Amino acid sequence: MTRTQYGSLRAGGLNWDSMPLKLFAGGNAKFWDPAGIDFSRDRADWESLTERERDYATRLCAQFIAGEESVTQDIQPFMSAMRAEGRLGDEMYLTQFAFEEAKHTQVFRLWLDAVGVSEDLHGYLDDLPAYREIFFDRLPDALGMLAADPSPAAQVRASVTYNHVVEGMLALTGYFAWHKICVDRGILPGMQELVHRIGDDERRHMAWGTFTCRRHVAADDANWSVFEARMNELIPIALRLTEEGFELYGDDTPFGLSLDEFMQYSADKGMRRFGTISSARGRPLAEIDLDYSPLQLEDTFAAEDRQALAATA
């Protein structure tokens, strides 16, 4: 691709109020260093857990760290798609996005090292076929497709896969599990801080995905059908992954976690995204760039979680 001009040199400069650059500024303001989290108490808490509890927590962590590594690698074609559209603000934000995913991979590995988990963990994914379908096939395929086809429809399919299902359902449900494990028992303070830091980053990631889908739906209503179809295709797989994780432990799930509660939680997070995207239908495209409702949705989810967890404490 031949470079012909610079977005940062255009008359008027960059629109710092646009959604992508608001997210970029937010990430800069909330920078954190994985090496700065204190995991010193987590080792003793880890050793106090039963073998079955450690097995569950290790499997949960394996899913997270493999997922973070996956998205660190798979996000690259989205940057190229933004460049092809001439959207420098989005491209700037996605460089930060990729950096944050790499930090998330780092911090989960640091935690595993701190609690003494050093064996090969691939086996923890073998009993989760829905996980393998999403992370081994659906995610890399959808994002990899952008290298050859950066069209709006392909971007919507990729964003649904990554931002709305992987992050917006699976990751949020996983954070909910960590909160139930750690906060209810007052254990693993390092993991608690880790989840807080990552969750803050990923609220911005999910908001960008929602913004991107809204932008394309506002520009062409046909993209609403693309969004609907992809969500309806992937939500059942995401819910099946939650079921598979519980089925491995029978009727005695460690930490007293409830399948029904987690299925309801995950489904709620998926279904409520439809309304935010559909609200962009027929909207003037110029309004979408300055509409911060995608970030407000993620903040609402976070506030609801804090309230629910406080009620059970």
UniProtKB/Swiss-Prot annotation:
Positions with a binding annotation for Mn(2+): 68, 101, 104
CDD domains in the cross-refs: RNRR2_Rv0233_like
Biological processes, Gene Ontology terms: deoxyribonucleotide biosynthetic process
Position(s), cross-link 3-(O4'-tyrosyl)-valine (Val-Tyr): 71-162
Gene3D superfamilies reported in the protein's UniProt record: Ribonucleotide Reductase, subunit A (1.10.620.20)
Any one GO molecular-function label of the UniProt entry: oxidoreductase activity
Main function: Probable oxidase that might be involved in lipid metabolism.
Keyword Oxidoreductase set for record: yes
Cofactor: Fe cation; Mn(2+)
Keyword vocabulary terms for this entry: Iron, Manganese, Metal-binding, Oxidoreductase
Disulfide bonds: none
Family membership: Belongs to the ribonucleoside diphosphate reductase small chain family. R2-like ligand binding oxidase subfamily.
Residues reported to bind Fe cation: 101, 167, 202, 205
Protein's name according to its UniProt entry: R2-like ligand binding oxidase
The keyword Ribonucleoprotein is assigned to this record: no
EC number assigned by the record: 1.-.-.-
Free-text comment on the cofactor: Binds 1 Fe cation per subunit.
Subunit structure as annotated in this protein's UniProt entry: Homodimer.
